[in-house]
Amino acid sequence: MSLLEEIAPSVQQVAEAIALAVGVEVEIVDNQLTIVGGTSVYMQRIGEKEESGEIDGNYLYARVLRTGNTEYITDAQNDQTYGITVDAFGSFELAEICTPIKADEHILGIIGLVALNEDQRSILLDKNKNMVKFVEKMAD
């Protein structure tokens, strides 16, 4: 069990607080790509693997886990390295800011700020630099 799974109720509270403060959806995964917390469609997927659990893959979350760098995807549907943009519930991911959760230089997981509609996408695009700084501070 990962550290984030051990504190899953707190992880879920953080996801909900970020979503309320920022106005976008939040997905939090651990270092094995297990969804540990989230809002909207991600809450329904807690316990499932993101990106099929392929931590050596080339999609967004696997890259962020490997590199430790924040990535900002402005057009998820047309970004071939993003991954699947629609889930079983029919929600389309339009944009995302994804940053690693670090402790003592170890990557514990990822926080993703996700736009599922144009209003949320506008929030991520309009406040790009501030949103990146915000999510990086939350992940520290």
Q: What does each model-found stretch correspond to?
A:
Residues 66-131:
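Sensory/regulatory domains in signal-transduction proteins
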Residues 1-17, 21, 109-140:
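Juxtadomain coupling helices with adjacent low-complexity linkers
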Residues 51-54, 60-62, 96-100, 122-123, ...:
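Glycine-rich loops and low-complexity Gly/Arg-rich segments
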